[in-house]
């Protein structure tokens, strides 16, 4: 039987294997969670058109702050002998202060944060401790949060006046700046984590290659974080272009070809596509489709349409890519509904 070595710190006993599991498995999970938060911060930034909505700034800074703080704490958990011993861990590990965490990290590495990276840490720390729950404080000036974010964006262009109307193309430069600096900061801490994990023979850095965390930490090895977000939007556009240009007769294309489309306002299509590429659905589009459904007097027809729509993008549906014989075309829709997984009726 394997002979476990016991480490005794602060009166607590912990097996060496348990510490290894904590650093390798638990911190690996934390790394993926951190990546999700950071990705959401960038994704939200890609979707904004200005700084007039406080809730959008809150989401950007909250998810960014939480994601980076988790990275800092992961690294400290790797360098500490027993990070689960509450009596011996540094105070900053159980608090929320990005600067104090960075000071502790600097005791274990010679790597240095960039000037912009340190500034962004300050914004996150300030937000997390002073603005995260500011709406619960009567009399708290909501404009201060906007000023906090602008104070960082001005490092890209200090002369820009955010209080004056600007073209979207002008604002894009600031979105790119924040996302790229966020990506650099995330990459900085990830590399510290990866190097330390390899040094102590843990697998903390091994993450799901199809996760958002991989897009944050791994894809940014060969492109900037902003470029990563742009290629994701371009991928959606390329798919839409392919579907529009290729009149196929197999797979999901046959279903799309057989269905009648609803009437749409061509002038609004580009706005709908913009929201789609940003990972959201246009509110006007939702209201319009809902209204058209309500106007469908034929309940059976409305039910059938919803059943067909339920097949599109449904991973449990396997489309036949073989050519259909002419005499099979009439039974196509009926055969598609033989699966017990597809629910019918107005519940869709």
Residue ranges and their predicted role:
Residues 44, 48, 107, 111, ...:
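Surface-exposed polar/charged interaction patches
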Residues 131, 144, 163-169, 348:
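Intrinsically disordered, low-complexity segments enriched in charged and polar residues
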Residues 150-212:
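Amphipathic, Lys/Arg-enriched alpha-helical patches that create a basic surface
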Residues 9-64, 75, 79-93:
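Charged alpha-helical initiation segments
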Residues 66-70:
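Long, contiguous alpha-helical bundle segments
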Residues 209-348:
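Charge-dense, extended regions
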């Amino acid at each position: 039987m394997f002979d476990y070595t016991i480490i005794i710190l602060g009166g607590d006993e912990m097996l060496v294997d348990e510490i290894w599991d904590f650093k390798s498995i638990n911190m690996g999970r934390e790394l993926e969670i951190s990546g999700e938060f950071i990705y959401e911060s960038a994704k939200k930034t890609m979707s904004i058109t200005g700084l007039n909505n406080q809730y959008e700034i809150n989401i950007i800074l909250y998810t960014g702050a939480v994601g980076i703080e988790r990275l800092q704490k992961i690294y400290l958990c790797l360098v500490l002998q027993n990070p689960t011993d509450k009596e011996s861990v540094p105070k900053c590990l159980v608090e929320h202060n990005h600067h104090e965490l960075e000071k502790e990290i600097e005791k274990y590495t010679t790597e240095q944060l960039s000037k912009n990276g340190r500034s962004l840490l300050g914004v996150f720390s300030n937000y997390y401790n002073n603005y995260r729950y500011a709406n619960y404080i009567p009399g708290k000036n909501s404009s201060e949060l906007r000023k906090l974010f602008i104070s960082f964006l001005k490092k890209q262009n200090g002369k820009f006046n955010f209080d004056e109307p600007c073209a979207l193309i002008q604002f894009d430069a600031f979105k790119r700046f924040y996302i790229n600096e966020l990506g650099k900061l995330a990459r900085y801490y990830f590399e510290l984590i990866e190097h330390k994990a390899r040094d102590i023979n843990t697998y903390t850095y091994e993450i799901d290659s199809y996760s958002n965390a991989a897009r944050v930490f791994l894809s940014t090895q060969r492109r900037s974080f902003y470029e990563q977000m742009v290629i994701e939007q371009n991928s959606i556009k390329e798919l839409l272009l392919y579907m529009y240009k290729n009149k196929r007769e197999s797979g999901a294309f046959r279903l799309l070809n057989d269905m009648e489309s609803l009437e749409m306002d061509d002038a609004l299509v580009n706005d709908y596509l913009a929201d789609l590429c940003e990972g959201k659905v246009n509110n006007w589009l939702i209201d319009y489709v809902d209204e058209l459904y309500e106007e469908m007097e034929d309940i059976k027809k409305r039910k059938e349409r919803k059943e067909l729509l339920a097949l599109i993008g449904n991973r449990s549906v396997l489309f036949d890519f073989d050519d259909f014989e002419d005499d099979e075309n009439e039974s196509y829709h009926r055969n598609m509904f033989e699966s017990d997984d597809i629910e019918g009726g107005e519940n869709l």
